[in-house]
Amino acid sequence: MQKEIDRIKDIENLILDSTNLKMLLLNPLSIIYGIEQKKGDLREIYTAKINNKIRLYIKPIGKFPYNVIEITELEFLKIDNKHYGDG
């Protein structure tokens, strides 16, 4: 469990080090952490990979559709492990 907590802290630090959502998404660490926008009804949400089973849901503060340059604040919504099987 400590590994997952450390990963969440690393993702939080990456977000804090990014000046806006665009810089976060362009950062190569975003690929390592699997930060990506959801599709369909959840397209307002971004997720980050905590491990093979657990995803962190992240929502930009602002109105959708987002201007990725203007978004400077994100909130952690929840941690989800129900759709990814054994991790």
What are these regions (language model features)?
Residues 1-15:
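Arg/Lys-rich, positively charged N-terminal/basic patches that mediate binding to nucleic acids
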Residues 15, 22, 43, 75-78:
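Compositionally biased amphipathic helical and low-complexity segments enriched in hydrophobic
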Residues 39, 46-87:
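Enriched for short, Lys/Arg-rich terminal
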Residues 20-46:
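A short, surface-exposed loop/turn module that caps and links secondary-structure elements
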Residues 14-17, 21-24, 84-85:
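A generic signature of intrinsically disordered, low-complexity regions enriched in glycine/proline
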